[in-house]
Amino acid sequence: LDEPDNYLDVPGKRWLEDQLRATQKTVLLVSHDRALLARAATRIAAIELGAAGNTVWVHGRGFATFAKARQERFARFEELRRRWDEQHAKLRELMLMYKNKAAFNSDMASRYQAAVTRLAKFEEAGPPQAVPLRQQVSMRLSGGRTGRRAVVVEQLELTGLMKPFDAEIWFGDRVAVLGSNGSGKSHFLRLLARGGSSPEPGNTSVDHALIDPVRFTGVARLGARVRPGLIAQTHAHPELIGRTLIEILHRGDDHRDGMGREAAARVLDRYELAKAAEQRYDTLSGGQQARLQILLLQLAGATLLLLDEPTDNLDLESAEALEAGLDAFEGTVIAVTHDRWFARGFDRFLVFGADGSVYEADEPVWDEGRVARSR
């Protein structure tokens, strides 16, 4: 199963987890959903990057112990390499000592040859397995100060989707938007990304992607200096197709300055995109496109991050880097998510309910069913 949980809401994910736990069949599952892995996987096979090629390490237990076991494994590799380097230095030092002595004392020639042989055999056996290469993704999301009220919603109704609701979102809030598929969550983000119900010049989106209009009644108002930036679930950016990553950063656009190629290469490296610098945007993997979108929001100076399923295409290291970046972000974050692990980092939860209502909860609510609509 290759990412079978993508595009599933939480009831769908739970159903999938129950099926995986119940089946007697062998299941090989590719997934980056940490909650699903914790509930359903009994062993973890990790593809590890290496200079000489990738390898697979199998952790014989579940996801709960995976991170600690991998950290301990890497520490063992580092210790073995340290010991090998020490022994190699001693053998080389011994060989050089006998070499110097043999130059003045022929009786030392045999000892010198023995030392040369020992060193050669040691080097031929080679060092222990190298520590696997790890992704070093660093997402530096800066943001900026805005008015205290970042978003004010008054009797907002997403036509044909949800009933009217009110909400106030304050500067610095981390709001997770929860609910089943098709409940209107993405429409809500799109409305905010377009500047709200009556966009002001200071609320212009930093995102160049064409954002489809949303039918609504009521008010959705953005605060002073709130500049929304949207990461859509599909990463569709027609204006980037056919352009390389270096070209995108070098030329800039209306919302961000261009940068020199060396500076562009450095910032791509922080997002583990340096090797893809000369690739066209449309040839990138879903995870690479997602990381680039986050990078572009960083460079454009968004102060309101609107994230639609941001972890769907991110591997574990990138998801953790995003979480760290959001923790340090000076601004407001509103994220639609079905990622139960990711939602732990949020402090407010706006739930789109099965009855068409929108309400705030003190903790994540994952059991809302599909909205019943007249047909």
Task: Identify the function of each model-found stretch.
Residues 1-77, 139, 145-375:
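ABC ATP-binding cassette signature C-motif
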Residues 73-164:
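Flexible nucleotide-interacting loop at or near the entrance of a catalytic core
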